[in-house]
């Protein structure tokens, strides 16, 4: 391969192992030689020689939801750039048995570290109770419980959304929460509450709890309109905001003229809602980089390594405006 590419064996090794200090044109020649020769790395042999598998185990549930799926994509990109591959194990249910089986599954593949994408309070508690023989990192966990956590600042994101509506002149903001056994949902609820209190506003009772789906947002919207007529609503994610928009439309209410709506996530479709949705963007690519940085620091022996939370960003579109009255 080195002969075909016209480079040294050391250069081929650096390209194969993902080192960044290789000139782009040299890397391209090596990759072309790999393609021409049909080279496939013998991972088992490499593991025996180096005692490193170059693999990170990832345990997650709820991959059908935008957040966990996007975290996986961001982590996959960051791990590849660092020269690692991912070994995935799913959780069919949140239980000690299921989590232990998933951990054993990835450990059987000789992974060097384990990343647990924690969305539920119960899963977080179970993760802390396990004995894992390799370094591990939690995603969207509780920073107060362990520094070995990477995530997006959900409280800050909810404050951005709520402050935006209050700064437009709305006297109160209702909140459509996600499932409150999810850590993200409870953090977004807390950020909403904090923003209202900082503005001296009364904190309204929570609306019907949603489950992240458009259907639940629609149902919560109908229940809300049967009891009150808000001027501003912060939905815990964009999909629930979409269902809420449908409920408002069916009730003959205009967005944003009658009711302003803010979502959370900035899913790719949110700019094409009717109207385009004001929302809070989570940078999952940056989150993937920080997860991988935390993994590498743990592998280097830093027992209390930490990384800062990713800061979310408010994306203002056409679903919010000052109250008409």
Language-model features and meaning:
Residues 43, 61-70, 88-97, 150-160, ...:
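Hinge/beta->alpha junction and helix N-cap segments in small-molecule ligand-binding domains
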Residues 223-325:
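Flexible loop/turn connectors
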Residues 11, 48-64, 164, 172-179:
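Short beta-strand segments enriched in small/hydrophobic residues
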Residues 55-163, 167:
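Alpha-helical recognition/docking segments in bacterial nutrient-uptake
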Residues 1-54, 324:
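N-terminal helix-turn-helix DNA-binding module of bacterial transcription factors
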Residues 8, 54, 112, 170-172, ...:
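Short acidic/polar active-site loop segments enriched in Thr and Asp
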């Amino acid at each position: 391969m080195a002969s075909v590419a016209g480079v040294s064996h050391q250069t081929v090794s650096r390209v194969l192992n993902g080192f960044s200090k290789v000139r782009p044109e040299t890397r391209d020649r090596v990759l072309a030689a790999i393609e021409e020769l049909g080279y496939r790395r013998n991972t088992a042999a490499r593991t025996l020689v180096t005692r490193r598998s170059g693999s990170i185990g990832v345990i997650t549930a709820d991959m059908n939801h935008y957040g966990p799926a996007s975290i996986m994509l961001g982590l996959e990109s960051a791990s590849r750039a660092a020269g690692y591959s991912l070994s995935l194990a799913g959780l069919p249910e949140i239980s000690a048995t299921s989590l232990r089986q998933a951990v054993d599954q990835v450990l059987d593949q000789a992974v060097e570290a384990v990343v647990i994408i924690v969305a539920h309070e119960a899963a977080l508690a179970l993760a802390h109770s396990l004995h894992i023989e390799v370094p591990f990192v939690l995603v969207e966990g509780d920073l107060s419980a362990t520094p070995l956590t990477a995530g997006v600042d959900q409280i800050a994101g909810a404050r951005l959304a709520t402050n935006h509506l209050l700064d437009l002149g709305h006297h109160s903001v209702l909140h459509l929460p996600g499932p409150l056994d999810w850590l993200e949902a409870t953090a977004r609820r807390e950020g909403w509450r904090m923003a209202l209190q900082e503005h001296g506003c009364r904190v309204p009772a929570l609306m019907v709890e949603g489950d992240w789906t458009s259907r639940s947002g629609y149902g919560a919207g109908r229940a809300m309109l049967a009891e009150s007529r808000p001027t501003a609503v912060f939905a815990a994610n964009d999909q629930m905001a979409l269902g809420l928009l449908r409920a408002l439309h069916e009730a003959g209410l205009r967005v944003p003229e009658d009711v302003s709506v803010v979502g959370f996530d900035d899913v790719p479709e949110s700019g094409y809602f009717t109207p385009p949705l004001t929302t809070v963007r989570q940078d999952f690519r940056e989150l993937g980089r920080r997860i991988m940085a935390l993994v590498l620091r743990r592998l280097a022996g830093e027992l209390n390594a930490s990384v800062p939370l990713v800061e979310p960003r408010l994306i203002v579109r056409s679903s919010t405006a000052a109250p008409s009255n």
